[in-house]
Amino acid sequence: EETKVLPKLNFWGYTKGNYFAVKSSYARNAAKASMEYKALIRKLHQHGMECVMEFFFPEGTDQNLILAALRFWVMEYHVDGFHLLGEKLPMTAIAQDKRLSRTKIFYTDFGDAGEKERSYRNLYVYKDEYQYPARKMLNHFGYDLDEFIDQQRKQGSVLGFVNYISDNNGFTLADLFMYNERHNEDNGENNCDGNAWNFSNNYGVEGPTAKRYINRLRKRQWRNAILMIMMAQGVPLLWSGDEFGNSQAGNNNAYCQDNPIGWINWKSERSRRDQKLFFENVARFRREHPILANPMPFQFCDYKALGCPDLSFHGENAWMIRPQGGGLALGMLYCGAYSVDAAYQEDVYVAYNFSASETVLALPGVGKTRQWYLQIDSSDDKTPYLAEPKVCAEGNITLPPHTIRVLAGREVPQHKKRKERGRKAGI
C-alpha cells in the first residue's frame, strides 16, 4: 500500500478516533507518555489548578463510546473537565452520568439537560455569544449597547457561561487590534481558511508599527478587552498568551503552524511585563470582589432592602441609560452587600466609554460611611492599576476616549477605625 506524505501537519488534531490514547508527541519520553501526563495532572492539582481536556466527536459517534471515553479519563487520570466539540452529542446522558457528576462539562448547547439537571452545577455554555458583542463595542462595528449589557450581566441559575473575546479559532487578543484582515497565507490555502468575520481594527496600520500613538491606542484597547472579560459575570477565559499580548502575526487559524507563528513567544513576555502585571492585578481585583462573579442572576432591584439594587445602570443621569442601544457609554454599579462572601462587600462601579470622545457619566453616592476610590484606569499608560487608589467625588465621573475605569466603594478610614475600636470595646 502506498504511503502519502502530507504537505502539512494538523497538530491540533480534531480527527476521529484515538479517544483513549495520550498524545505521545507531547511527552518528553513517548514510551512514558501516560505516566508523564498523570504526573502533570498531579502537579496541577498541587498548585490549585485544574485540567480540562478538549474532545471532538463527529456526528454519529456511538453514545456508549463517548461516555466510556469520558469516564476513562476521569477515573484513570483524574481530569477535572471536558470541552466537547461535535454535533448532537448525548448531553442529557452526560449530565446525568453519576461518574461525571463532579466533572465540569463545557459545550455549546445543553438543550433540555441544562434545565433538568439542577442537582449539580457542572454544566457550562461555551460558545461565541460573548465574543462578537464585545468586539463590536470595542472596534465600533454595528455595536449594540443593550446586547453588550446582556452579555456583561449574563448568569444562569443552573448553567454557567464562559466569556471570551479571543480563542484558538480566531485572532489573538493583541492581533484583534493590529490587523483588519486575516493573514493565513502560510497555511497553504490561499488565505481562504479561518474566520473572515473578525470585527477587528488595526487603528491605521496593518500589523506592527513604530508609530507610538497607534501602539498606545492598541495597548489601551487590549486593557479594555481584559477589563470587559474580567468585569463580566460568568467564567472569564483567555487564550494562552493573551495575558501579555502574544501575537500570531495575523494568522487566525494556526492549526498547522507548529512554528513561531503558532507558538507562544515566552521571550516577549519579559518585554511585556507591564501587560502581564496588569492582568494579574485585575484578576486579583475580581477575586477580591465576588459580586463580579455572583452565583445567581441579578434581579436589578433591592429585593433584600440593603440600600441599593444588586445591579444598576447609569448614563448621563444616575439610574438611567440611553435606550435602544444608541450610546457607547454606561456605568454599571454592583452592590457589594449582595455578595455571597461577607468578608468582601465593597461596591464596584465600572464606567465604560467606548466612544472616540470624552464622556461624563453619573456617579451615585455610596452612603455616609463610604467613598468611591478609583482603582483601575485603562487610559493610564504607566499605572493603569493604581497601587494607591484615588478618592473620587460623588456626582459624576469624566472618561477619556476609549476608556474603562473601575471604582471601589470602600469605608472611609476614619469610620473604619471607629468600627474597629467599637468591636474591641464590645460595642
What kind of feature is each model-predicted range?
Residues 91-245, 253-257, 290-297, 303-310, ...:
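Conserved alpha/beta catalytic core and glycan-binding cleft of carbohydrate-active enzymes
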Residues 44, 48, 74-77, 81, ...:
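A generic secondary-structure signal for well-formed alpha-helical elements
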